[in-house]
Amino acid sequence: MGMTKKLREKWNEALQAVLPIIAIVLVLCFVIAPISSSILLCFLLGAVLLLAGMMLFTLGAELAMSPMGERVGTCLTKSRKLPVVIGLSFLLGFIITISEPDLQVLANQVPAVPNMTLILSVACGVGAFLVVALMRMLFSVALPPLLLVFYGVVFVLAMFVPKAFLSVAFDSGGVTTGPMTVPFIMALGVGISATRSDRHAADDSFGLVALCSIGPILAVMILSMIFKADSSAYTPPVIPEIGDSKELFLLFARELPVYMKEIAVSLLPIILFFMIFQIFMLKLTTRKLKKIAIGLVYTYAGLVLFLTGVNVGFMPAGNYLGQVLAKSAHPLFLVPIAMIMGYFIVKAEPAVYVLNKQVEEITDGAISSKAMGMGLSLGVAVSLGLAMVRVLTGISILWFLIPGYAIALGISFFVPKIYTAIAFDSGGVASGPMTAAFLLPMAQGACSALGGNIVTDAFGVVAMVAMTPLITIQVMGLASRIRAKRGAQEGMSAARGQSGAYAAFELLDDDAIIEL
């Protein structure tokens, strides 16, 4: 397929994902929640950048990030030296986390803990859990018991974490698995499982993001107790005031270099890590390297445009919409509106496209992209509804997370293994930049307008979005298992009926059969 045709295909996919969000926001602006022309213009230009960014990023991930991850994973497994695998896995997890742009944002929300201490601790957490995830794959250890143990530790620690810090701690799991790291980590799993020939290899292709998401939560919780952090910080987004088209252009032009630098810093360690593998182990042909290089350029340009559009155009719009809806005569409308937004907005998360495509390929179409998309959308819709209930009532996040994870972990022992791994991966994937830069500001704006505690009541949206897909995707798996059993039983009944008919014929002589 030519590059122009591929770009057109990715553009159509981006349109399908983003147009519903634009339509919903415009309907809200013109019918229910009027906003200033400055915010609306920023939103519309941000939407154009988001569309272009998504198109380029999805193509770049396909050409570069996924092949790089798969080849590194295959290479790691073939080394056959456990200390080397452990050391390189930890280093890889550490490097790709420390360069994640959203980690700096998280660090700024925790003023009691020095930024560098928090960043290094979270990076170590991801590195350690990436090692655990790879060891699980290499030694074919079941995922549900591991998740039960580690989440058990998380919720025991939650009892000792300051209340004002709890939501931020749980948000950290989704924040640090961003669009830069997720495609690479997921492809790493595919590369490792490809070297195995047993029947559970496909099941173990997933689960890396699931375990890596736990590391930051534990790291942030432990730090909050060590430093006795009793508060976290919230800086409201600046609502832009645009006088003319030139000011609109300058607003985006000022922010563009910031994201160019951030994404360059994020991509560079991954490229260097891959080049070390290329020099000493992979030795790919010039043609393959050229294809990866082109893919990296697309990835870079796509993420720069995407993050500029989301953070400059979408964040102020989300915050202001939340304020207007909360101040309206019917603030309860926040719940259904947030659910509708959540249903569609997850489709615009860059890493969700990568996850859905990979799931369809690994399962040979048994779990389709459409089914995955539906499961994620329903999960995020429920999570946004619950998040707005928290904003309106001030209920502690633990009243939602403990039952939610208890259900998710309980179901995991009864569904096909691959569904559990995909479900827990999808939690980290769904809670990406669209959630952090549009849905979270919307909750913060609503909470601010209602006079609530933003730190305890509005933070936690990312954690809620990361939780509900664990249940919805596994319910899909449970339904598929029930259907398979029912089909098998019907097949056996039909076979028994058929064999009974043959037996009846055998009792008759030839003349009797002719008469029949």
Predicted features by range, described:
Residues A17, F43-M55, A112-C124, D171-I185, ...:
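Structural signature of hydrophobic alpha-helical transmembrane segments
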Residues M1-L59, T74-C75, G173, M186, ...:
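Signature of multi-pass transmembrane helix bundles
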Residues L41-C42, G60, A107-I119, R136-G152, ...:
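Transmembrane helix-loop boundary segments of multi-pass membrane transporters
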Residues L130, L134-S140, F165, V190-D204, ...:
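Alpha-helical transmembrane segments
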Residues F160-V168, A219-K228, F306-G313, G385-L386, ...:
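Hydrophobic alpha-helical transmembrane segments in multi-pass integral membrane proteins
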Residues L82-V153, P331-S412:
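Helix-loop-helix junctions within the multi-pass membrane cores of secondary transporters/permeases
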Residues E62-R80, V105-P111, F314-A329, A351-I367, ...:
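Flexible loop linkers connecting adjacent transmembrane helices
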Residues I21-V25, G53, K81-S89, V149-F160, ...:
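Small-residue-rich segments of transmembrane alpha-helices in multi-pass membrane proteins
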